[in-house]
Amino acid sequence: MSQDIRKEDGVRSATEYKLSMSSNPGSRRSSMADAESFNDDNMVLKNDVLREYLLPQIKDLTDSVVTLDSNMTRLNFIHDNLVDLNESFGSLLYGLMCNSWCVEFPNAPTRFDKEIRLMNEIEELSAEKSKLKSRLNSLREKPNAQTSDEKMKKPSGISQPIFQKPNVRRPRNALNDENLHKFNRENPPVYDDKREADEDTNSEASFVSNPANSKDMQLFANGSSNNDPKSRLRRKSILHTIRNSIASTSDAYDRKKQQGIQMGRVSLGGGAARVVSGRNMFEQQRTTRHSTTGIPNRVVKKRPPFK
């Protein structure tokens, strides 16, 4: 269509607008017929004025009308092209709209995003609610199952503990000779002078060397008016028994260690004395160190009996 318009534009020339002036003088108006009566000079002047002023303006007007005609033709051509462009652009927009409805764009903002988000939250809450309900039901059913199992397992008249202790073999708290001797070497006993002075009066040696004396027992009982003498002597006898047992075990260990060593022969020229070694020798040195000479008003030969 546009090519046809261009061809027509190239073939067709601009329209020429001519004045409607006939060459027949008889067809003129009466006013112009009356002009024949004027002088020839006046006619010449009028013709000159028309030629100089009116005819150029009329020519300009005709040229302008021709230019206007050509411009209007081009404007019509432009309008036709714009119509075609609008049709093609409208079809393009329609195709894009159809494509957008058919194809899903995940990152494109839509008005349904908020509703979709709310629906997802509602689904998550409903799933969590169902899980909590199932857990509650399981917790409610567990105690009933436990009670039924306990009733089935319990025999008549016997109550068994729920949590039974495993069969674990406990270590024996037995003291060996080596461990006991090591403990005595690392932790030597601490003795008090006053208690040693009181305990020396109740040792086995004192019981042998000093027989029972009723007067000393009365003095001893009168001196300890605050405490019961029987209970104190009983406690001291228990302590002596423990000490003697420890000393005997340490002696046995020393004998094992000192096998093969020849002991010097004890001369019998002097008085009778106890032959001790190891722990008993330490006890003898301690008893000699804590002698009774430092205690005032004490009779060594008269001691209370050992109980």
Curated annotation (Swiss-Prot):
- Residue segments, region Disordered: 1-34, 133-212, 280-307
Record keywords: Cell cycle, Cell division, Centromere, Chromosome, Chromosome partition, Coiled coil, Cytoplasm, Cytoskeleton, Kinetochore, Microtubule, Mitosis, Nucleus
InterPro entries associated with the record: DASH_Dam1
This protein's GO cellular component annotations are: cytoplasm; DASH complex; mitotic spindle polar microtubule; mitotic spindle pole body
Here the segments flagged for biased composition (Low complexity) are 20-32
The GO terms this record gives for MF are: identical protein binding; microtubule plus-end binding
Tell me what this protein is called: DASH complex subunit DAM1
Query: Which species is listed as the source?
Result: Candida glabrata (strain ATCC 2001 / BCRC 20586 / JCM 3761 / NBRC 0622 / NRRL Y-65 / CBS 138) (Yeast)
What gene is behind this protein? DAM1
